[in-house]
């Protein structure tokens, strides 16, 4: 029963954290590439379902059956993190800041664009100073596409 209480408290704390982040987060108006908000709410639903299953199974002492619930919580957290953190923001003429799922940022210049690699579930943009991973669910702005084309011509 103690495990169920701890799991419920941790689940509720994470739920409050993610909900506050999405409410405080400004709209994606300044982003040239972003993950749509519906993915956050899908992740939230999966997280809540997983937390319910996990806490219920821990409460009745079925530790083995709590594992699928905990895995659902992990997938829900990953979806919410992607929606909140993974984006590309324009900071000037042809300069962009890419933020990963975990919030790590890197600057890229459109003139440093080398090539694009299409994967089954994403795009990888190669630049002279690194690479940028863009998920297939991401919304890509026309300005970003055009600046990459212009950068490739130079």
Show where each model-derived region lies.
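Canonical phosphoinositide-binding patch of PH/PH-like domains
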Residues: 124-149
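N-terminal membrane-targeting/pre-transmembrane regions
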Residues: 1-57
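Phosphoinositide-dependent membrane-docking surfaces
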Residues: 96, 105-121
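Small-residue hotspots
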Residues: 43-54, 66-79
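Hydrophobic alpha-helical transmembrane segments
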Residues: 1-7, 60-73
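Generic beta-strand structural signal
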Residues: 91-93, 118, 127
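Membrane-helix interface/capping segments
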Residues: 25-28, 58, 89-96
């Amino acid at each position: 029963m103690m495990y169920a209480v701890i799991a419920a408290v941790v689940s509720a704390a994470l739920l409050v954290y993610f909900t506050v982040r999405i409410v405080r987060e400004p709209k994606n108006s300044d982003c040239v590439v972003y993950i749509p908000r519906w993915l956050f709410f899908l992740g939230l639903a999966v997280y809540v379902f997983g937390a319910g299953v996990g806490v219920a199974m821990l409460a009745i002492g079925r530790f083995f059956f709590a594992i699928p619930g905990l895995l659902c919580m992990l997938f829900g957290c990953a979806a919410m993190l992607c929606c909140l953190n993974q984006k590309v923001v324009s900071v000037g003429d042809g300069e962009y800041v890419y933020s990963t799922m975990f919030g790590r940022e890197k600057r890229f210049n459109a003139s440093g664009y080398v090539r694009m690699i299409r994967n089954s579930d994403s795009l990888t943009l190669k630049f002279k100073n690194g690479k940028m991973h863009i998920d297939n669910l991401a919304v890509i702005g026309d300005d970003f596409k055009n600046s990459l084309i212009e950068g490739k011509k130079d």
